[in-house]
Amino acid sequence: MDAFQSVAFDYGRRALVSPFFGALWAALIVWYLVTYLISPLRRFPGPILAGWTNLWRIYHVRKGKVHILTTELHKKYGPVVRIAPNVVDLDMPELIRTIYSTRGDYRKTEFYHGSSAKNNGKIIYNLFSECDPQVHAQQKRPIAKHYSMSGVLPLEPHIDETIGFLCRRLEEEFIDGPKAGRLCDIGQWLLYYTWDVVGKVTFSEPIGYLEKGYDFDHTIAISDKAMDYFALVSQLPILDHLMDKNPIYRIGPPSFGNITNISIQHLIDRLQGKDTAYHNPSKPDFLDKFIEAKATFPNVVDDAQIISYLMINMIAGADTTAITLNAALYFALKNPAVWKRLQDETSSLHSESSIIVPFKTAQDLPYLNAVIREAMRMHPGVAMCLERYVPDEGLTLPDGQFIPGGCIVGMNPYVLARNQSVWGEDADFFRPERWLRDPTRETEEAYQERLKRMNAADLTFGAGSRVCIGRSLGMMEVYKVMATLVSRYEVELADPKGEWKTHNSFFVRQEGIEVKLRRRST
């Protein structure tokens, strides 16, 4: 009898549950169908699944090639492509100043929230993830002047010391003595350089990757995993609240606890005068400037805000700079004529083999400038749609189509960099000469107009009020180390026919740039 009752109860329960779940699935299907049919974005072309669910984006982002896919979609569908139920990706350089304006009326979306931290149950938004224009301006104002070119130039001695140590370590490991001739994973060493520069300009002390020659504290690996996580949850921000920001149990990437601890300890040591062994007040670093900002803006900057500033420097200041360096070196080496022209341009610097090229000198090298600009065009550090909410009044596209307020629009720097109306029919090819004037074919006036058009279409560092705050520092690092490496060393790819590997997790990381190094002959 008990067995019969148990079977009967189980059957009855299934009879009740099955219709419930059936009704739930039916309701979801109806909801998706109605949402799809009434969406104001339905008329815009794109993959069918992209119009139904953000899972389409998550799938392709996870594969690490979404920038290439998006470019192919624009070639297929045109300048307007629907990439999610409420998101349209635009290949319209003429709208950059509208969507990414200094007014901030096209607000950042929740896409960026995944890079925030959570402390004592409260989500802490940083300069990158803060979407409110007024709050962002309030956070940025106390430190903005320190990131201008005039603000970062006093940091050049810190960068000089790090470049000098990079050269010493490269010579020890790959050029001199019994280790001469070993293949060098130059991309990895340039990453160590950029991370150590961040430590040097922020705390006056390198983190130690160049000295040890590997990711000894796993911070770089953790940073990569954190970016992999961010790239995925940014496509469907609710996932971040269910995982990393879960109020009950955190399910997320490895935390930046070590970076937080480094930042806190350096702040304590500085305030207590315990870092005099490596900190020289006559060579101020960012921590000095943040403490100064606390005194000047006490209502905005407290110790917690200083830690936030320090962490932004640490987390965001190294990867994109290394990506640009890797791209410039890789594309130059893949094109021997380009590398030869760089060597010729720096031949006068080669006579002083111990020199660390000053930024002013490097900046005045026209072909080096062209190579770096072209490398950033071909391989921007960020290569995803930079989302913004359309304001209430909506957006009228150049072709007359209308996108209502509340929808999301954005542009991908990688896609814009292949727009043939700006860059020409050879937009898919690395050609530094496009940044230079050919006196036999172009007047100065025509060149300046073309240069203006190219600059206006460049979204490498963002634009408007949310332009990358670390742009000047990053470019100083890139110009100085590129000029120094080219002037000092003969560099060739270990496999000239091989290709690097890239993975797009918002930042487009590279690997597989192995080279042979030797000193330049006199």
Predicted segment positions?
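Short, small-residue alpha-helix embedded
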Residues: 320-333, 481
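Cytochrome P450 heme-thiolate monooxygenase catalytic core
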Residues: 108-120, 154-325
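N-terminal membrane-proximal hinge/A-helix region immediately C-terminal to the signal-anchor transmembrane segment
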Residues: 2-138, 160-165, 193, 219, ...
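Cytochrome P450 heme-binding "Cys pocket" and the immediately downstream C-terminal segment
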Residues: 171-172, 336-339, 453-454, 467, ...
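Cytochrome P450 heme-thiolate "Cys pocket" and heme-binding signature region
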Residues: 145, 311, 359-360, 437-478, ...
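C-terminal helix/juxtamembrane-tail motif
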Residues: 1-7, 508-522
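Cytochrome P450 I-helix active-site segment
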Residues: 49, 156, 160, 180, ...
